[in-house]
Amino acid sequence: MCIRLLLGYRQLGKAGFLQAALKNLDFLWTGWDDELGGGIYWYKDRSSKNACSNAPAAIAFLLAYQCTGNEEYLEKGKLIYDWMNGALRENDLFADNIVVETGAKNHWKGIYNQATMIYAGSLLYEITGDETYYDLTRRTVNATLELMFREEQTADGAAEIRMNGNPIFKAWCVGWLARSYVKFYETDPAKDTKPMDMLKGVLDRELLTRTEDGLYDPFFCSGQSDPDNVSELLAQDGVASAFLCAAYYNVFLR
């Protein structure tokens, strides 16, 4: 919610959006403590600290800094980002969570967690110009290419890019992957086109999955299926977000 409010404030200038976001950030920070060296809890039972509660929080605090210039938000964004890299980074990807009582980790590498850390790292590089953030982010981008995509040959010998199903979880996670790749490209001095080229290859195939009802495959032709998920609004939002990011990239960035 904070991220959407802050992006809405930047686009529309509505003070109410900013006020609501900052109030929510105050509450969000109550989930941070020094157990396991820091990090924000996933839930009020304080049993685990998850990538999906920390990486988006880092984004929100960094956006709040960009909207207000308040250094406190920048410092909190850095703290969260640094904690993620210290506690959950594994071979340039991010584990799902760590249990507070035992320190045990869930090593699943969901794409949402990778995408939000790419976005957070891109913001930090954009704000600070510190090459450390760029290097960490670039390495995660490259790791997601191996995690998410595979190249196959069609019957006529043509190359075809496909997505691996397990890291997807939900289509809205791929929407976040598209946002993060666009944000990385915007800040990347090398202007590496490979991440978006790979994603666009998947989206070209995704266009062909449109049903008579106007719905798309929420697993992006990866081979996974969930009939109950096809008509879910959140699933189709993820597809639409990925299409919009690709269109923005093609029209405004290339």
Residue ranges and their predicted role:
Residues 1-67, 71, 75-78:
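Extended ligand-binding groove/face enriched in aromatic
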Residues 104-153:
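Eukaryotic tandem repeat interaction scaffolds
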Residues 8, 49, 132, 139, ...:
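CBM-like carbohydrate-recognition segments
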